[in-house]
């Protein structure tokens, strides 16, 4: 602890050990105190990787921190991320990242592409969150997806869920676009300047990215047909004037498709400290869920059913016993826990 100054004077710093041969000096009290503080600070900390600053993921992660972080027993760190596929990699590989928000189709896609070894055993889910709508905003003069053939279309950064879904969407519909990979706010500026034909953004409506588009811009959302092939993976949805009053006429709606968002988690081995941390997070989420359903929390929380199943995913069991077949633990990442 800190030294106490005698009356009329300043506290003297403790003498430093002299350099020289011999065994290392024993840790000082201050070093031990710092180690204890470090352990205490990390004991209840859970990292949640989200998305870009203009998307819904980051707002959901911020809500998780605002509601569940009590500053003592549980701290929730909301982290900006780069999209679903990168989030899966970050959950598996980055120290301090336990949980991430990803699209429900990301796990199957990453598995098919063999992007990460052992993915199916090391990634589980806590809850299905809500459905995210596919937004395809086009410049004036373009009225259908087929008109995007051969055109420059921004599909977000590589590794993002939007890039993945856009690739699957246009491939399924047989439309060959010229994909661009700018971040979304840059793409919106380029779209307004006529440098690209359209931009694709997968996000829960209403997405903040489009809030600043002024009425009369000429930009418009393109309808996405709910073909049988697309409905094998996605859900039908729509964008209404209530969601985007500057982009959708009053009383009208634009047909589109949606994909589920999932709260993914690393499959920590039961009995480890990291498993206990996530279990505390899950308990707090269940206990405080009602607080997410009222303002100022994001309206998408009202679509969440914590008991909903996610096909193709394994649910994280907060009360799990030791698994019968142990996978290699991620404790070698040396998380400070």
Identify the residue ranges that each predicted region occupies.
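Segments of small-molecule ligand-sensing domains
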Residues: 255-337
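Signal peptide-directed extracytoplasmic domains
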Residues: 104-141
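Immediate post-signal peptide segment of exported/extracytoplasmic ligand-binding proteins
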Residues: 10-48, 141-152
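N-terminal export signals
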Residues: 1-13
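Pocket-lining segment of extracytoplasmic ligand-binding domains
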Residues: 12, 104-105, 114, 175-272
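Pocket-flanking alpha-helical
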Residues: 65-66, 77-118, 187-190, 196, ...
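Bilobed "Venus flytrap"/periplasmic-binding protein-like clamshell domains
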Residues: 45-68, 132-189, 193
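Extracytoplasmic
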Residues: 41-45, 55, 71-73, 83-86, ...
């Amino acid at each position: 602890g800190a030294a106490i100054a005698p009356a009329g004077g300043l506290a003297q710093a403790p003498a430093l050990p002299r350099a020289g041969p011999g065994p290392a000096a024993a840790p000082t009290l201050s070093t031990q105190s710092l180690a204890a503080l470090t352990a205490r600070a990390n004991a209840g900390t859970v990292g949640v990787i989200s998305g870009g600053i203009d998307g819904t993921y980051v707002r959901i992660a911020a809500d998780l921190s605002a509601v569940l972080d009590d500053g003592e027993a549980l701290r929730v760190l909301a982290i900006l991320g780069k999209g679903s596929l990168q989030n899966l990699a970050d959950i598996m590989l980055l120290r301090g990242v336990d949980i991430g928000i990803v699209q429900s189709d990301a796990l199957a896609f990453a598995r098919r592409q063999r992007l990460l070894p052992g993915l199916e055993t090391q990634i589980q889910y806590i809850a299905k969150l809500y459905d995210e709508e596919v937004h395809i905003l086009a410049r004036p003069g373009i009225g259908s997806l087929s008109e995007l053939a051969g055109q420059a279309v921004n599909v977000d950064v590589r590794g993002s869920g939007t890039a993945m879904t856009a690739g699957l969407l246009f491939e399924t519909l047989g439309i060959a676009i010229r994909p661009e990979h700018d971040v979304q706010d840059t793409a919106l500026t380029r779209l307004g300047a006529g440098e690209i034909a359209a931009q694709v953004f997968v996000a829960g409506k209403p997405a903040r990215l489009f809030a600043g588009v002024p009425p009369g811009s000429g930009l418009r959302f393109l309808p996405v047909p709910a073909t049988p092939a697309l409905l094998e993976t996605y859900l039908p949805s729509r964008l209404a004037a209530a969601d985007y009053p500057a982009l959708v006429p009053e009383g009208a709606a634009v047909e589109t498709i949606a994909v589920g968002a999932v709260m993914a988690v690393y499959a920590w081995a039961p009995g480890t400290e990291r498993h206990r941390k996530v279990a505390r997070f899950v308990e707090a989420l269940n206990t405080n869920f009602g607080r997410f359903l009222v303002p100022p929390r994001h309206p998408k929380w009202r679509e969440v059913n914590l008991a909903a199943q996610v096909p193709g995913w394994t649910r994280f069991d907060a009360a799990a016993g030791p698994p019968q077949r142990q996978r290699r633990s991620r404790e070698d990442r040396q998380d400070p826990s």
